[in-house]
Amino acid sequence: MALDRSALIPALKNVATRLRIDSVRSTSEAGSGHPTSCCSAADIMAALFFAELRFDPQDPHNVDADRFVLSKGHAAPILYAAWAEAGAFDRAELLNLRKIDSDLEGHPTPRLPFVDVATGSLGQGICAAIGSALNARRIRSDYRTYVLLGDGESAEGSVWEAADTAAVDGLDNLCGIVDVNALGQSRATMWGHDMEALAARWRAFGWHAIVIDGHDVGAILDAFGEARRTVGRPTMILARTIKGKGISFVEGKDGWHGKAFKKGEELDRALAELEKQFVPAPAGANLTSLITKPAARPRAVESPKTVAPPAYKLGDEIATREAYGVALAKLGEADSRVVALDADVKNSTFSDKFEKVFPERFYENYIAEQVMIGAAMGLAARGAIPFPSTFACFLTRAFDFIRMAAISNVGIKMAGSHAGISIGEDGPSQMALEDLAMFRAQPDFAVLYPSDGVSTER
């Protein structure tokens, strides 16, 4: 039975306090981490996990479960604390944070079953969240995707590539939250607590923007409800928060980013202050038992069809990039999981051959290679087989995303056309010379360099 609001809010406040305590305690045990960045997000995380998300702690891969991406990956301790609070694993395991033999790394990776993509390189989580939201459309699921960003992170250009893309695609199943605590690593963030300036930017990019007090649990719940009711565009909740919230001697103070509390007097003082913040809650207010679980439906088992072999005649001339387009369309016919992503060069890479046959599985990202690779990561993490393609030299713009895709161990198939000096007359800006080294430097990457149309298709 659902709790009424008068019972729910104090229960969520107590969850937020426990999340702060667990984050502080685990980082102090590790001797490193970002406890103040966790404390600013605690009320958001409590409301999100225990009053908004539909998920099953024991089945995080449920295809219809809502997805959460922690784009501000340095706040990993509070992500782990939330999953422990939900019953995914024993709370005592949190004290193994950052140990060499623990999966609870300093920034989250898919070594954990409840993490879809690795984050920590800022500005990437929102791009992956777009891929997750697109995948919900692909499989005709009503799951929603939530992504938590930091305000310092929001200076990254890839965040605004994502903002553009999500708005153009009308992703009303995507909800972002910016933890606006106004402090970065070394100084105040770009816009501080100027909430209307931040909101104006998101609105200008076509998002529904909501400004709230990020420590007012009731306001957080209302914002999530408003996001669910918003149709035709994504929502960004801008939550005004205080870094280090709940611990008086670090609240809103610069110089505490990435610093664990020292064991002894400093840690004891922080924990003592947090322990005093529990509020009376109705008996039986067990939020874990109230988590809304999606219905369990059998995971679809794809049975790909046989792909037709190349059908060129002796003497036919075909560019490798055109053969790529032919092969991509064949793969799309053989396997419904195959999707294609483009950076406004589909008529050069010939991925438009796929678009003509499967427009609903073709995603145009325009000239924004970072969000193209990030969205491919999110799609792959949810079961799609994405083929992002552009000129090979322009894939180097997304090098950090490719690096994180390798860490995430997601199966994306990148195609770069106009390789090497084959486009010599266009000059060096169009030549792909460094990309092979970039790809070969990544673990478990296979690099294929076809010599003709037949080898391209095969």
Language-model segment annotations:
Residues 55-61, 65-67, 103-281, 441-458:
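Glycine-rich ThDP/TPP pyrophosphate-binding loop and its adjacent helix/strand module
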Residues 1-146, 268-269, 281-458:
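Thiamine diphosphate
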